[in-house]
Amino acid sequence: MREFVGHGIGKEMHEDPQVPNYGKRGYGPLMKRGLCIAIEPMITLGDRQVIMERDGWTVRTRDRKCAAHFEHTVAVGAGEADILSSFKFIEEVLGDKAI
């Protein structure tokens, strides 16, 4: 699923840099202190080719196998990144049913 990438986030929802979910370490955009990015890993059990549905929003894999998308927003710091997004509320609502 290489058509979709993580991205910078700030005044606008989607900003540079684009952050691919694939590649070689050390070859992507430079992550500078203060940069906020949305990291959006995607996995599929089958083909990485995708089809965009007519509604302009829904995406599925060409072979219709299961796929998943997850997102975290992080701020690049001097050491470790700070995770700005939290899914704690999902765990609180779902309790034992949370994955």
Model-derived regions, located:
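Charged, cofactor-coupling segments
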Residues: G23-I99
